[in-house]
Amino acid sequence: MRTAARSGESGGMDSTQNKALIRSFIDEYQTGADERALRRIVHPDVIDHSRPPGISPGIEGVREQFDGFRAAFSGFRATVLHQVAEGDLVVTHKVFTGRHDGEFAGVAPTGRDVEIVVMDIVRVADGRIVEHWNCVDRLGLMMQLGALPIPSGAVPSGA
């Protein structure tokens, strides 16, 4: 991918602007499903270091992932809990919520309300997301869906 900025530089945007850009992406695309926001904010050749198997690279992979979440979880939305930025990097701790009423990861709809805890790191260059890393509590999600047993005495988020 070619960008004008190197790691540590964000193409003239400061940390506050980078955080606002990521908030816009979360509100307008992840929650709002606005395709224009996706194209405006995410570089076409974004590198997703956490891309699941079978998902396309680049912006198309971002679209595939969120189309899948929206198909599986009605009312899908993101709530930002914490956000910090330094230079061209923005870290966001957030929770996705929704009702499981479509198949997800081979699990038939359960009708359960779920919470998916996520930590994202994104790199911004020239006003666009160019790189992404994340940690998703997939284990907790699968326990909420009943696909995995809940360890004795444990209560997963969303339960």
Language model regions located:
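C-terminal and inter-domain tail/linker signature
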Residues: 1-159
